[in-house]
């Protein structure tokens, strides 16, 4: 099945579908899903011996300023299988840039039906500071040993900013679609 058949979400931007590419706490391998075929490719092996602190994926049928779909960090105590789709609520955004330009990461929690443990989280200020520190540390350092690559963190934004980014990314995707 081509992943283009998976929608961005039923009630965007309040609820989004996230295709998982990298499970939480997995080996330091950067996977990327080929959007047309659905195949999971190894993009690269991270040079730093670090594990992703949360499940990492993207929202289908979105297009951000960097030319890629919207990246999403799914806060959940368990790893999810690559290629799985999880319905989430955006609660914040990690503002960052790298050698290729702006590269925001939407922070999301699963909807209550999937995991009720985070049903109370509506905005970034309700996310554990421990989670936020782990995520920030990972993204600030995961490219440290890769030549010509760098990352700069520009702080956190709330749910309203995350939802604005998602809305704009869907509009950009729709305006660029053939």
Swiss-Prot record:
Q: Name one GO molecular function term.
A: magnesium ion binding
Q: Which residues bind Mg(2+) 2?
A: 71
InterPro entries hit by this protein: Pyrophosphatase (IPR008162), Pyrophosphatase_sf (IPR036649)
From the UniProt record, list the reaction(s) this protein catalyses: diphosphate + H2O = 2 phosphate + H(+)
Top-level taxonomic group: Bacteria
Q: Does the keyword Disulfide bond apply?
A: no
Say where the protein is mainly found. Answer: cytoplasm
Q: Does the keyword Cytoplasm apply?
A: yes
Q: Name one Pfam family in it.
A: Pyrophosphatase
Q: Which NCBIfam families does the annotation name?
A: PRK01250.1
Function according to Swiss-Prot or TrEMBL: Catalyzes the hydrolysis of inorganic pyrophosphate (PPi) forming two phosphate ions.
> What's the name of the protein?
Inorganic pyrophosphatase
């Amino acid at each position: 099945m081509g992943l283009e058949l998976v929608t961005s979400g039923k009630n965007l931007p309040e609820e989004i579908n996230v295709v998982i590419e990298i499970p939480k706490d997995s080996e330091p391998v950067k996977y990327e899903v080929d959007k047309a075929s659905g195949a999971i490719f190894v993009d690269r092996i991270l040079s730093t011996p670090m594990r992703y602190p949360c499940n990492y994926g993207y929202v289908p049928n979105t297009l951000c300023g960097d030319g890629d779909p919207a990246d999403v960090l799914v806060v959940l105590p368990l790893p999810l299988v690559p290629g799985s789709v999880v319905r989430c609520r955006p609660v914040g955004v990690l503002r960052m840039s790298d050698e290729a330009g702006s590269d925001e990461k939407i922070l999301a929690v699963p909807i209550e039906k999937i995991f009720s443990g985070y049903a109370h989280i509506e905005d970034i200020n309700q996310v554990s500071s421990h989670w936020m520190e782990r995520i920030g540390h990972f993204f600030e350092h995961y490219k440290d040993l890769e030549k010509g690559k760098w990352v700069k963190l520009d702080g956190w934004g709330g749910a309203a900013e995350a939802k604005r980014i998602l809305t704009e990314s869907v509009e950009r995707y729709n305006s660029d679609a053939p």
